[in-house]
Amino acid sequence: MVEIEIEPHEEFEGVYWAIFEDGRKKPATENLVPGHQVYGERLVEYDGKEYRVWEPRRSKLAAMIMNGMEYFPFEEGSKVLYLGAAAGTTPSHVSDIIKESGVEYCVEFASRMMQELIPVCEKRPNMIPILGDATKPHGYAPLVEQVDVIYQDIAQPKQAEVVADNAEAFLRPGGYVIVAIKARSIDVTKEPEEVFEDEERKLEERGFEVLEVIDLEPYERDHVGIVAEYHG
């Protein structure tokens, strides 16, 4: 059996490194629901606790961590709005980090994905599944309180506008957004760098201070993660 060691991340609360025998490492989180996997991820017992290896090819947030992310606004007790929750892969790791005292509103538009997301949420009391359209935040406004962080991973053209509209509705002043930007979803005719700069500018025009832009290569092609603070 391959021995895997677990060490806390140098800076990020609730994030760990799973260190393999050959020296490779991947992010990990302590499992809020021991014994349960979400997407076939590896479970590791270490010092009496169970950890879930966080696969960067399955999660853009894990890819950001692998690629040197500097700002990580999640912590125990955080209130999070997750736009584009899909089947719950990344949201489940966020759930591990914010623990029982946090809450994560998981908005997903596709009913087929929702069928996969709901069983994940049923096992994790801090995850609330919401069938909704991220472009129409008023549709789920009665269900969502003010949050500390908005994480967005949606493949559609107006990504900066969507996260800004949601921030106006739900994000506390001084809160943070993390946006996974896919250039080809926004404009296939432009170079990715140009698309990313356009999205940064749109965020700044809507009251955000962009803190960092993280290239997601080699895990995702033509993607970046943008972390920004909201000043309203």
From Swiss-Prot:
EC number from the UniProt entry: 2.1.1.-
Q: Name one GO molecular function term.
A: RNA binding
Q: Which cysteines are joined by disulfide bonds?
A: none
What general EC class does the enzyme of this chain belong to? transferase
Name the positions where S-adenosyl-L-methionine binds. T89, T90, E108, F109, D133, A134, D153, I154, A155, Q156
| Pfam families, per the entry | Fibrillarin
| UniProt keyword list | Methyltransferase, RNA-binding, rRNA processing, Transferase, tRNA processing
Question: What family does the database annotate?
Answer: Belongs to the methyltransferase superfamily. Fibrillarin family.
Which protein is depicted? Fibrillarin-like rRNA/tRNA 2'-O-methyltransferase
Provenance organism:
Methanopyrus kandleri (strain AV19 / DSM 6324 / JCM 9639 / NBRC 100938)
Annotated gene: flpA
